[in-house]
């Protein structure tokens, strides 16, 4: 299932990054590294997101929604999936 609006407001997700309340899955770190991004570079992409980068919201578990963004970076287009529970989790970060 998916919906057309972000589950978490983008400003809230970006504030969590700035407050250090963020972590990443291993696969997202690996995908970022394949594109030339270290963790700080991935965070820079998240803080630069705009509403226009939003693609969809989906969930694998009906209690955990994931917001999907598709920003364009100097390294190319990124498929970026975020979820917020207690902190921001970068679930997916890979070349589109």
Predicted regions and their residues:
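Ribonuclease/tRNase effector modules and their secretory precursors
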Residues: 1-96
């Amino acid at each position: 299932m998916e919906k057309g609006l972000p589950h978490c407001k983008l400003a809230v997700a970006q504030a969590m990054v700035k407050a250090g309340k963020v972590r990443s899955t291993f696969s997202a770190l690996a995908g970022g590294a394949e594109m030339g991004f270290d963790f700080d570079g991935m965070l820079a992409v998240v803080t630069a997101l705009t509403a226009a980068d939003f693609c969809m919201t989906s969930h694998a578990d009906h209690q955990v929604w994931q917001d999907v963004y598709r920003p364009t970076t100097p390294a190319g287009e990124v498929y970026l999936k975020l979820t917020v529970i207690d902190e921001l989790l970068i679930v997916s970060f890979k070349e589109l």
